[in-house]
Amino acid sequence: NKPWAKNLSFDEFCHYILPYRNGDEDLSDWRSYLKQKYEHLITDSLMQNANTKDLAEFMMRQIRKNVKYGTQFNRLIQGFLTPKETEKLGALECKACANYATMVMRACGIPCEVIEMRWRFTEVPHSSVLFPKTANNPRPFRLTIGDSLTYMGEPKDTMATYRTWAYTYEVNKDLMDLARDKDVPRKFWQPLFRNDVTSLMCTTYDMQLPVPDSLKIKNYLFLCRFDNWEWYPIREGK
């Protein structure tokens, strides 16, 4: 019933607002907790304007008062935490920050999701919050606690990234098929609750590559990049 979400389809609502987890964080009553903490801060002018971009930037400024980006706890905790765990630590790496910001936005009825980008110039991925294209947001963008707003599909991102995932907390059937193949390494399909959104992040191309006869008996083949001392799949083919 929020102005910025009233034109969402049912599928969009289920995908961007309804999910109660982004990953493997402990279950908690985070929605009512964060709604009470943040929703009253939204001004009447923002309510009337219903502009997702302005609202997202305003909410992120409020979020940064409670949680900041920092790397001092990287060796102790990474990934998905409950909101109260995040606030207690105060400064966390990018995935935890994006997870917290996404839950705040969803608690206030703002459609979004966590994305994870693989950069060609660094060995570690980066996470942010994607605000998708909707009736009230004509151009998708990303924004998180440690980064400024950036529209998706900028030329610099095409040069810098090679794969982007969105965490949806719904099982990806294609990844589930990979998991059933005993020849596919576990790290190539875990986690299952994500969808490929690389085409939103950068320009993508179809390629045809010759397959050696010795590999034609395999169900799947992967085009990979050596990243962080291990192979990471850029794209898979069946």
Describe the predicted segments one by one:
Residues 1-89:
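Secondary-structure boundary elements
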Residues 46-62, 76-80, 84, 89-90, ...:
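Hydrophobic/aromatic-rich core segments of domains that either
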Residues 9, 28, 32, 45, ...:
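Generic serine detector
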Residues 1-3, 20-22, 66-67, 139-238:
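Alpha-helical and coiled-coil interaction segments, frequently adjacent to or embedded
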